[in-house]
């Protein structure tokens, strides 16, 4: 998360309410980045980072679109400041993508057969009792 440069322009009203949560998530992100990865698969070491990125973006999304607790100015400030992923939030606004875990799961160019990730398959269409985990972010099913 980028440092807030307060010398240029003060943050919008309501920043004091959002800042402690974003600082806490930033601290967790730093811990996840420095966490040792011995004993984990190569892809598993990035999963906590993807989860925290999702959590931070979802927090801003919920405050603005669901609870309407922050102003548009503060929302745009958070997007411009890198506190939330604007592309992920744009997908959450579309039908069928409300619970999307990360953008890598819907990119078809990263797969051999040009398909989406396994976590995008509805649970009703999977085998009963089969536990799935996305190789990109560790999601266990974000399609519903």
Curated annotation (Swiss-Prot):
Predominant location: nucleus
One example of a Gene Ontology biological process annotation: mRNA splicing, via spliceosome
Pfam families: BUD31 (PF01125)
Keyword set, alphabetical order: mRNA processing, mRNA splicing, Nucleus, Spliceosome
Cellular location(s): Nucleus
Keyword Nucleus set for record: yes
Chain span(s) of sequence motif Nuclear localization signal: 2-10
A cellular-component GO term for this protein: spliceosomal complex
Keyword Nucleus assigned: yes
The family this protein is said to belong to: Belongs to the BUD31 (G10) family.
The protein's assembly and partners: Identified in the spliceosome C complex.
Functional description taken from the UniProt entry: Involved in pre-mRNA splicing process.
Protein name in the entry: Protein BUD31 homolog
């Amino acid at each position: 998360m980028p440092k807030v440069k307060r010398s240029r322009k003060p943050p919008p009203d309501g920043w004091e309410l959002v800042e402690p949560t974003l600082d806490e998530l930033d601290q967790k992100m730093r811990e996840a980045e420095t966490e040792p990865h011995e004993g984990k698969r190569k892809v598993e070491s990035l999963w906590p980072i993807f989860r925290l990125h999702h959590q931070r973006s979802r927090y801003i999304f919920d405050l603005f679109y669901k609870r309407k607790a922050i102003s548009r100015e503060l929302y745009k400030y958070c997007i411009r400041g890198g506190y939330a992923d604007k592309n992920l939030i744009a997908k959450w606004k579309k039908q069928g993508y409300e619970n999307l875990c990360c953008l890598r799961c819907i990119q078809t160019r990263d797969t051999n057969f040009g398909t989406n990730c396994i976590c995008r398959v509805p649970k009703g269409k999977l085998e009963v009792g089969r536990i799935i985990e996305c190789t990109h972010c560790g999601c266990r099913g974000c399609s519903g």
